[in-house]
Regions:
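Flexible, glycine/small-residue-enriched loop-and-beta-strand segment within the central core
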Residues: 1-12, 18-122, 157-163
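Short beta-strand-to-turn element immediately C-terminal to the catalytic PLP-Schiff-base lysine
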Residues: 147, 154-156, 371, 385-390, ...
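N-terminal "arm"/small-domain region of PLP-dependent enzymes with the aminotransferase-like
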Residues: 162-198, 535
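Phosphate-binding glycine-rich loop
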Residues: 198-245, 259-262, 269-271, 293-303, ...
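PLP-dependent aminotransferase class I/II
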Residues: 203-210, 215-219, 294-307, 311-314, ...
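PLP-dependent aminotransferase-like
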Residues: 236, 240-317, 321-333, 337-342, ...
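Conserved active-site segment immediately N-terminal to the catalytic lysine
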Residues: 340-379, 408-413
């Protein structure tokens, strides 16, 4: 040890610690095999782990914990007081008793570049990299690269060597990665609500509504508490009356029909197109021609229920829009309202042959419903939804329905519901919204890669995307005739899957009162036992996709899988 060093007796030094000249250490702990550069000061109650390198002219203050394998560049400054002052509020010089240390933790494997300043009461995550000269004001996620003043996340580094990736589990959906990427923005949104006590309604919700309307190319966006509420309120606001029939498909999540029933309407079904899994225009036409009549007043009435048919709800399933030109043409001919269930289709587009342009989901019907369930392409950190419409009267009715029927506080024009989106979720959605277009593009790239790897494989049927569709691949769904065995095989190899959905709605016990039977919707019933959702999320890697396909194809070939033949649908 050099005579130029000041190392107090209370310093704990591990084995093979190397100390350069002109250092000042007191009350701290430095563990095995760590190197301390020249002109470094480390204060009491600071800890430096094993195999760390602390470069020259760095100041590590009281309350800092540095874990193993950390690199600290030259001239890095740590702080431990958010509001440093020389005197107390009474004007007296501060003493140690007046000082409240705010701790900082540098997790293992992190690197901090030269000249960086680390503010107190935060954490630098494992393997994170802080750029030279950065001013770090917030905690840094694991594996993040941050730079600037204030430091912002630029990108992420691999958390583990690629050689281990062949054994790592592949989730069906990764909700951790996107939140890790946006951790600073999401934390800011949450902190804003805490600091302003803005929890229900208010400017944060209004700002998100405006932004989502712009994103969707709609005139109005009304934020509500869930996608189910969004659809229910849209049905009611569009003028569907209790006892009216609303036509939809049986191949969807039950929330679609729940919204119809809870609006006191009656769901009736038409079959799907076998290629897109969405509402078949042919089957809708057959329903309207063969299963409906006009009564004496000219109303369209269902022969099944004897009730007036007033609306159609096409679902943009899995992130792909239904064939809206055909549906809208039929609806116009029969005087029906069209309400889009766009809960899985944020940003999806449809090329309208009628209008000769691409049109976004949520703007072709009289109104549309979106869900912000966490797993959606735009997901909250909880529940949420929105109604989009170009009709200001519908927008006003939805606003009234979501808030106890109020036109203003404590003045109620109707009985409504408690269906508001809270401001915390609105802030989180606002932070995520600018990234949705890029995430959707990444989903399309992942789908194209799956398609490339599986094209020509007879044992597995890949999704079909018509020329008029720009799907956003909320889900990537294939078909195979031994789905349950394949799910078990993929689970055994660490690959997550989903089934959307295993039992069609007309065969669910909840709708036994509708008196549908097996065989009523042959396309839906041929599809549901075979559909299998493979891992799909923007951060899915090419290596992971190759592994998924390898396991899917090899199992399908060995087991003799083959999807059912297409069922021809006609107007007969």
């Amino acid at each position: 040890m050099s005579t130029f060093n000041c190392v107090a007796d209370d310093v704990k030094l591990g084995k093979n610690v190397r100390l350069s000249k002109f250092i000042n250490l007191y009350g701290c702990e430095i563990q095995d095999d760590t190197k301390i550069g020249a002109f470094v000061e480390i204060q009491k109650n600071a800890t430096v782990g094993r195999r760390c390198k602390i470069s020259s002219h760095t100041f590590i203050c009281e309350g800092v914990t540095i874990e193993d394998n950390v690199f600290i560049g030259h001239g890095v400054m740590f702080t431990n007081d958010s509001y440093p002052r020389s005197t107390t509020a009474a004007g007296q010089m501060q003493t140690e008793a007046d000082w409240k240390v705010e701790p900082t933790v540098i997790r293992k494997g992190a690197s901090i570049g030269s000249g960086a300043t680390i503010l107190p009461n935060l954490e630098i995550g494992e393997n994170a990299i802080v750029g030279a000269g950065a001013v770090v004001t917030k905690s840094v996620p694991a594996n993040a690269i941050v730079a600037g003043n204030p430091a912002k996340v630029l990108r992420f580094v691999e958390s583990q060597p690629a050689v281990e990736e062949d054994e790592a589990p592949i989730p069906f959906l990764d909700l951790i990665a996107p939140h890790r990427e946006l951790e600073n923005e999401l934390t800011d949104a949450f902190r804003h609500s805490l600091r302003t006590a803005g929890f229900v309604g208010g400017p944060v919700v209004e700002k998100f509504e405006e932004a989502f309307a712009t994103f969707s190319d709609a005139k109005h966006s009304i934020a509500v508490s869930s996608g189910t509420d969004a659809l229910r309120f849209a049905i009611m606001a569009c003028g569907v009356q209790p006892g009216d029939v609303v036509v939809t498909v049986p191949n969807t999540f039950i929330a679609t029909t729940e919204a119809i029933s809870q609006a006191r309407a009656i769901p009736e079904f038409v079959d799907i197109d076998e290629q897109t899994y969405n509402m078949s225009v042919v089957m809708l036409q057959r329903y309207l021609e063969k299963q409906c009549i006009r009564d004496r007043s000219g109303r369209l009435v269902s022969l099944r229920s004897g009730r007036p048919v007033t609306a159609v709800i096409p679902i943009h399933l899995y992130g792909q829009m239904a064939d809206m030109d055909g549906i809208l043409e039929l609806a116009e001919s029969y005087g029906l309202i069209v309400i889009e269930d766009a809960c899985q289709a944020h940003g999806a587009e449809y090329f309208s042959r009628k209008h000769n342009r691409w049109i976004k989901a949520g703007t072709m019907g009289k109104a549309a419903a979106f869900s912000f369930y966490p797993g959606k392409n735009l997901g909250a950190c909880g529940e949420g939804g929105a109604v989009t419409t170009d009709d200001s009267n519908i927008a006003t009715k939805v606003k009234c329905l979501r808030d106890h029927g109020q036109v203003k506080k404590y003045y109620h024009d109707m009985e409504g519901y408690n269906g508001r989106l809270d401001a915390i979720q609105a802030g989180i959605l606002q932070a995520k919204l600018p990234h949705v277009a890029a995430w959707n593009a990444q989903r399309r790239e992942r789908a194209a890669e799956y398609n490339r790897l599986m094209t020509g494989e007879e044992a597995v049927r890949i999704p079909y995307e018509p020329s008029w569709s720009r799907a956003v691949y909320h889900l990537y769904v294939v078909r195979t005739n031994n789905r349950e065995e394949m799910i078990a095989h993929l689970k055994k190899t660490g690959i997550g899957t989903g089934v959307h959905y295993p039992v069609p709605l007309h065969l669910q016990r909840a709708y036994a009162s509708l008196s549908y039977s097996a065989g009523d919707f042959p396309v839906t019933e041929s599809v549901t036992p075979e559909i299998l959702s493979l891992p799909m999320f923007p951060q899915l890697t090419a290596f992971q996709q190759a592994r998924v396909v390898r396991e899917v194809v090899s199992f399908a070939r060995e087991s003799g899988s083959r999807p059912a033949e297409f069922i021809e649908t006609t107007l007969a």
